């Protein structure tokens, strides 16, 4: 499958011209690594099982050794080796060069790093693909053009039917779901992501066992209330109507989903 350009490509390029390193965060499967590899000239993947043990040993004992390689150098899922953060920060300070490193991560769980990276490591958030990025929207309406030329808007028509839009909403903007498969297979990507997030990731993020059914109920309630004026109390009431869950436990689950970058309020 050919690479589909992302709106964030230009954002990353500009940040690489201004900072020594850039951290890209976003939920699993939204395309962070693929996008980063378009601009990286070498990379380390900490979840590559063939190399993982060796990489982590070096990262824990002499992390600067992993910085050797063509630049920009990508560190995928860097949070598995948090000492790499300090090594990158120091190298950026010492060299004074911009565009040296890209880091990607699928969680915002607190990392024990001695330095925040401010003014050395810039951050950017990535999301699943928009309909324009997936080439389903014709892009005739541009918010930028409307602001720059408010009188230039003319009537236009979407190439998508109502059924197309409903399907796209259920499928989501996950790049893996855009490969040449049947519609049921495309929907299966979103279903599997939802299931694994609620049954595995929500507990693994901070090693706290959580109830998969409660997690699913909370996310379903969030989905129902997106783009509404519903507050946290309304969603909590919706959840507790079917789950015997306390307010404190509810917010614990919300915190877990925020760490996984699934919820972004």
Set out the residue ranges of the language-model regions.
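N-terminal pre-Walker A segment at the start of P-loop NTPase domains
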Residues: 1-13
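Hydrophobic anchor at the beta1->P-loop junction of P-loop NTPases
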Residues: 24
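P-loop (Walker A) phosphate-binding loop of NTP-binding proteins
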Residues: 27
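Conserved lysine of the Walker
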Residues: 32-33
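Conserved nucleotide-sensing/catalytic segment adjacent to the nucleotide-binding pocket
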Residues: 56-102
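Sensor-1/coupling segment of RecA-like P-loop NTPase cores
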Residues: 94-114, 257
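Short regulatory helix/loop adjacent to the ATP-binding pocket of P-loop NTPases
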Residues: 109-124, 135-140
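Interdomain hinge/linker elements that couple catalytic modules in large macromolecular machines
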Residues: 136-265
């Amino acid at each position: 499958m050919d690479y589909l350009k992302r709106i964030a490509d230009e954002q990353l390029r500009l940040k690489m011209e201004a900072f020594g390193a850039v951290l890209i965060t976003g939920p699993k499967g939204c395309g962070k690594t693929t996008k980063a590899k378009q601009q990286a000239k070498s990379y380390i993947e900490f979840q590559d099982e063939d190399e993982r043990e060796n990489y982590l040993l070096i990262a824990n004992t002499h992390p600067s050794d992993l910085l050797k390689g063509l630049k920009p150098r990508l560190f995928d899922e860097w949070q598995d080796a948090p000492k790499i953060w300090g090594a990158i920060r120091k190298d950026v300070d010492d060299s004074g060069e911009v565009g040296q490193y890209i880091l990607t991560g699928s969680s915002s769980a607190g990392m024990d790093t001695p330095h925040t990276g401010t003014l050395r490591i810039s951050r950017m958030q990535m999301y699943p693909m928009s309909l324009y990025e997936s080439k389903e929207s014709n892009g005739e309406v541009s918010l930028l053009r409307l602001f720059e030329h408010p009188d230039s808007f003319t009537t236009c028509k979407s190439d998508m039917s109502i059924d197309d839009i409903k399907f796209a909403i259920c499928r989501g903007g996950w790049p893996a779901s855009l490969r040449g498969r049947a519609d049921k297979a495309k929907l299966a990507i979103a279903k599997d992501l939802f299931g694994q997030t609620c049954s595995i990731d929500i507990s693994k993020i901070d090693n706290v066992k959580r109830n998969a059914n409660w997690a699913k109920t909370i996310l379903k309630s969030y989905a129902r209330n997106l783009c509404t004026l519903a507050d946290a109390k309304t969603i909590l009431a919706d959840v507790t109507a079917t789950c015997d869950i306390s307010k404190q436990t509810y917010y614990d689950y919300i915190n877990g989903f925020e760490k996984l970058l699934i919820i972004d309020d």
